[in-house]
């Protein structure tokens, strides 16, 4: 019978941490963003990749992920000291990372990456992309991942050979669908206003985001190095896009940039064979 992924939160819920994990043949460590933890209110009742995972053996995940985490947050000692210390505290079967998505979404929301077409072809998605800013963002995310991955190799680490799994998100449809808490808009949308601000044609919105995301995610794909124990799970193209005018849960997406339970189940299905290949079943 499949076992649910038992998720523990050392920072959010330290009082719920067990005295030991001897009852779990498989112990995972996770850090990331809302694709691993919809944690605005400090709990994990909402779907995520982590709680969509099922295993053949009892499995626990120590999760340091928070909604809104950027790769910069994850790399900052002020935020990730607990996560970093886990490498020296106990041996894990795998480390799961979810980062880079919020770096991109925040940059778009703040007016970076996109630009008016100007004199360029207004029907070409590339005309609306500031490649200099996009390259700078890729470099920033790359440096942050290098910092995070370096903790695994510190002299005090018990996990120098522990496999690490990263992922590549998917292509969100720009649409008027904010994230909601208790049914009320809480934050977002992120993409649609940014595209409207540069007068990008509606018909090109998804193509522009796909082009930006594909380029941006190359910096994560570049870390794929199975010989070094680093594996990138290619999740792009897994989810069915929402309709461009949908204001709420639609297809595989609960809002503009977050999958729903069905979407996360599809993403978890992409993780399972990769986990099995490294002995986590």
Question: What is each of the regions a protein language model found here?
Answer:
Residues 80-136, 170-179:
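Oxyanion-hole/transition-state-stabilizing segment in secreted/luminal serine hydrolases
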Residues 2-67:
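Serine-esterase "nucleophile elbow" of acetyl-processing enzymes
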Residues 120-146, 200-209:
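Surface-exposed cleft-lining segments at the edges of enzyme active sites
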